[in-house]
Amino acid sequence: MDSTGEFCWICHQPEGPLKRFCGCKGSCAVSHQDCLRGWLETSRRQTCALCGTPYSMKWKTKPLREWTWGEEEVLAAMEACLPLVLIPLAVLMIVMGTWLLVNHNGFLSPRMQVVLVVIVLLAMIVFSASASYVMVEGPGCLDTCTAKNSTVTVNSIDEAIATQQPTKTDLGLARETLSTRFRRGKCRSCCRLGCVRLCCV
């Protein structure tokens, strides 16, 4: 698709293979695959900003040893890990305190019993707060950590169509609806669901 007058809308360079990734026309119609990949990794968009066409792409998180840790990622990791450390400690304190109160009640002074009850109650509060924080804020912290540490594979429109094209070339069969194909039993033998997947066309 490298014709005269076309240039990448991201880097404005005409060199290299230019491909279409969305429904845009004119000067924003084509771009380099690497340029668009970098733009998507930075912007975290899933659709074209101009025409709204969803990109054919797949996100993959890098292995942990390849992660880059900026200040934002370190803070998010600390926010996510601190409650995960506090939860087992709180459970341990609750179990030990309850065990001491139940099994050794006769050996403990009244003041020590009050101290153990307070410790158990505080451990329950810490456990509840930490568990709530992990459930509410945990996904956001994980997203912050993985945002800069994931790569995207984006397909051009031609590549996306090629991977989803029907294997039969007969126009009559290609125009059939999925329900018609299901009723006629034209599904491939490899399909265990018995119908509506594109691989069974």
From Swiss-Prot:
Region listing for DIRT, in residue ranges: 52-79
GO MF annotations in UniProt: transferase activity; zinc ion binding
Zinc fingers, RING-CH-type class: 1-58
Secretion signal span: none
Membrane topology: Multi-pass membrane protein
Matches recorded under Pfam families: RINGv
Residues the entry annotates as binding Zn(2+) 2: 22, 24, 48, 51
Catalytic activity: [E2 ubiquitin-conjugating enzyme]-S-ubiquitinyl-L-cysteine + [acceptor protein]-L-cysteine = [E2 ubiquitin-conjugating enzyme]-L-cysteine + [acceptor protein]-S-ubiquitinyl-L-cysteine
TM region positions: 82-102, 114-134
Cytoplasmic compartment segments: 1-81, 135-201
Superkingdom to which the source organism belongs: Viruses
Extracellular compartment residues: 103-113
PROSITE patterns: ZF_RING_CH
A biological-process GO annotation: symbiont-mediated suppression of host antigen processing and presentation of peptide antigen via MHC class I
Sites where the protein binds Zn(2+) 1: 8, 11, 32, 35
Subcellular localization, as worded in the UniProt entry: Host endoplasmic reticulum membrane
Pathway, per record: Protein modification; protein ubiquitination
InterPro entries, alphabetized: Znf_RING-CH (IPR011016), Znf_RING/FYVE/PHD (IPR013083)
GO cellular component: host cell endoplasmic reticulum membrane; membrane
EC number: 2.3.2.36
PANTHER family recorded: E3 UBIQUITIN-PROTEIN LIGASE MARCH 2/3 FAMILY MEMBER, FI20425P1
Function field: E3 ubiquitin-protein ligase that mediates ubiquitination of host surface class I (MHC-I) H-2D(b)/H2-D1 and H-2K(b)/H2-K1 molecules before they exit the endoplasmic reticulum, leading to their degradation by the endoplasmic reticulum-associated degradation (ERAD) system, thus blocking the immune detection of virus-infected cells. Mediates ubiquitination of lysine, as well as serine and threonine residues present in the cytoplasmic tail of surface class I molecules. Promotes ubiquitination of hydroxylated serine or threonine residues via ester bonds instead of the classical isopeptide linkage.
Further facts: Murine herpesvirus 76 (MHV76) is identical to murine herpesvirus 68 except for a large deletion at the genome left end of the unique region.
Assembly: Interacts with host UBE2J2.
Entry note about domains: The DIRT (domain in between the RING-CH-type and the first transmembrane) region is essential to determine substrate residues that can be ubiquitinated. The RING-CH-type zinc finger (also named RINGV-type zinc-finger) mediates the E3 ubiquitin ligase activity.
The protein's name: E3 ubiquitin-protein ligase MIR1
Species, as recorded: Murid herpesvirus 4
